[in-house]
Swiss-Prot record:
Pfam families: Ribosomal_L16. PANTHER family: 50S/60S RIBOSOMAL PROTEIN L16, LARGE RIBOSOMAL SUBUNIT PROTEIN UL16M. Keywords: Ribonucleoprotein, Ribosomal protein, RNA-binding, rRNA-binding, tRNA-binding. The keyword tRNA-binding applies. Part of the 50S ribosomal subunit. This is Large ribosomal subunit protein uL16. Binds 23S rRNA and is also seen to make contacts with the A and possibly P site tRNAs. HAMAP family: Ribosomal_uL16. One of its GO terms (biological process) is translation. GO terms for molecular function: rRNA binding; structural constituent of ribosome; tRNA binding. It comes from Lachnospira eligens (strain ATCC 27750 / DSM 3376 / VPI C15-48 / C15-B4) (Eubacterium eligens). GO terms for cellular component: cytosolic large ribosomal subunit. It comes from the Bacteria. InterPro entries: Ribosomal_uL16 (IPR047873), Ribosomal_uL16_bact-type (IPR000114), Ribosomal_uL16_CS (IPR020798), Ribosomal_uL16_dom (IPR016180), Ribosomal_uL16_sf (IPR036920).
């Protein structure tokens, strides 16, 4: 599972997920990708499950790129513990994903193989996603300007 090697502060505020992704919203390495359409937290084990689903489907061909990293710690208190007495223990690491963020990319395989592998990966993720190609995103940017 993915997690940071070391962090300056072990506990963070929850933060907000308002707005759209301004960075990481283009396909840079692969030909096809998964783009988030709603904001969510994606746990490190969900990222790993999506990666395994894709790599098992494409077998030896192609390459998978993971474009998100879980760098936000999430804490929780045990069930049956009263309020107060400090912040809870570290439970998991999450990646904060905003709408428009490219989460996974795939290259080196045929289009139908890539789309099926990405479809399998979207079922492992907690947010609504869409599968896009590099041409889709580049075409969308030109029409807006």
């Amino acid at each position: 599972m993915l997690l940071p090697k070391r962090v300056k502060h072990r506990r963070q505020f929850r933060g907000s997920m308002a707005g759209k992704a301004t960075r990481g919203n283009k396909i840079t390495n692969g030909e096809f990708g998964i783009v988030a359409t709603e904001p969510c937290w994606i746990k490190s084990n969900q990222i790993e499950a999506a990666r395994v689903a894709m790599t098992r489907y494409i077998k030896r061909g192609g390459k998978v790129f993971i474009k998100i990293f879980p760098d936000k710690p999430v804490t929780g208190k045990p069930i049956g513990v009263r309020m107060g007495k400090g912040k809870g223990n570290l439970e998991c690491w999450v990646a904060v994903v905003k709408p428009g963020r490219v989460m996974f990319e795939i290259s080196g395989v045929a289009e139908e193989t890539a789309r099926e592998a990405l479809r399998l990966a979207t079922h492992k993720l907690p947010c609504k996603c869409k599968i896009v190609s590099r041409a889709d995103l580049e075409g969308g940017d030109n029409s807006e300007n």
